[in-house]
Amino acid sequence: MKCYTKTIFHEESSKSPKGMDRWLYPDMVGVRFLHAEWSNENLIAFSKKFDTLPIKLVSFELKKEISVHNCRECYFQAISNSSWANEGYLVGRHIDTHNPQLMDLLKRLHASFGIGVIDLRTNEDKSAILLNAKYKEKINYTVALELSTKNEKFSGFLKSVVDYDPDFPNRYKDEFDEVKKKEELYPNPSLSF
């Protein structure tokens, strides 16, 4: 999934009465510029003139660990703060995929609510989308407005999406999060998971 992402720090958001914004902010948002992946210039031009540009807004809730004990809470937090996007994902650094109870629970929640699940590992080959998010044609503009009003980074992310030009991708490298290599994140291999 080639996705340009931006980390959203809820600590940098405007303050509301205690508890009002609980589970409002996703940990990370992303965008896929599907038209930038096309190689046919005529198709790109056609899309720009007669169609809406094919993009996909994605929202992520990140968790260190997802277990049977915290699965529902993690999943419902992901529903709360990621359902506004075209696709929402719950991302776990450690998901015991060999636990049938956990996997069954995730599948049932996914069938009901459509939030996808990603098992994230430092070894890219071991990372996996366990359950694809159900795609929603339209984003929830009410929630997107609230997020952009309360968080400058989210508002800036939306501006970067609007301004993005696939012919000049380097211009946007500072506007989206840098994707670091595993060696930069974990210089000591014994610390990777």
For each of these PLM feature ranges, what is it?
Residues 73-76:
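Charged helix-capping and loop-helix junction motifs
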